[in-house]
Swiss-Prot record:
Belongs to the bacterial ribosomal protein bL12 family. Homodimer. Part of the ribosomal stalk of the 50S ribosomal subunit. Forms a multimeric L10(L12)X complex, where L10 forms an elongated spine to which 2 to 4 L12 dimers bind in a sequential fashion. Binds GTP-bound translation factors. One of its GO terms (biological process) is translation. HAMAP family: Ribosomal_bL12. One of its GO terms (cellular component) is cytosolic large ribosomal subunit. This is Large ribosomal subunit protein bL12.
Length: 125
């Protein structure tokens, strides 16, 4: 496995998997991934440098309200989640609830568009 393949594999990991990987690397090599305090500099400079790096890559799609057309929204929720009729109905009836978590921005926008087309109120976090 070369460097590019390793990087690609890391890109495809979920956040929880990345946390486990970092812990395993720390244990294996006896190091810490925490940045030393002396290297950070002033808190203001550290915060300014960290802000652009923290761009969100995974999003949660939250159904805020099913609207007047619950049956059509229910069908879309079942299509998106793969839930059974009862589970999807319970989810739609107990808004606000997350429909899909940890998805890409593009997928979140597509899900939001499908649900809003049926009259639902949707939020992406």
């Amino acid at each position: 496995m070369n460097k590019e393949e390793i990087i690609q594999a890391i890109k495809e990991m979920k956040v929880t998997e990345l946390v486990e990987l970092v812990k395993a690397l720390e244990e294996e090599f006896g190091v810490s991934a925490a940045m030393p305090v002396a290297a950070v500099g002033s808190p203001v400079a550290g915060a300014a440098a960290a802000a652009p790096v923290e761009e969100k890559t995974t999003f949660d799609v939250i159904l805020k309200d099913a609207g007047a057309n619950k049956i059509k929204v229910l069908k879309v929720v079942r299509e998106i989640t793969g839930l059974g009729l009862k589970e999807a109905k319970d989810l739609v009836d107990s808004t606000p609830k997350p429909i899909k978590e940890g998805v890409s921005k593009q997928e979140a926008e597509e899900i939001k568009a499908k649900l809003e087309a049926e009259g639902a109120v949707v939020e992406i976090k």
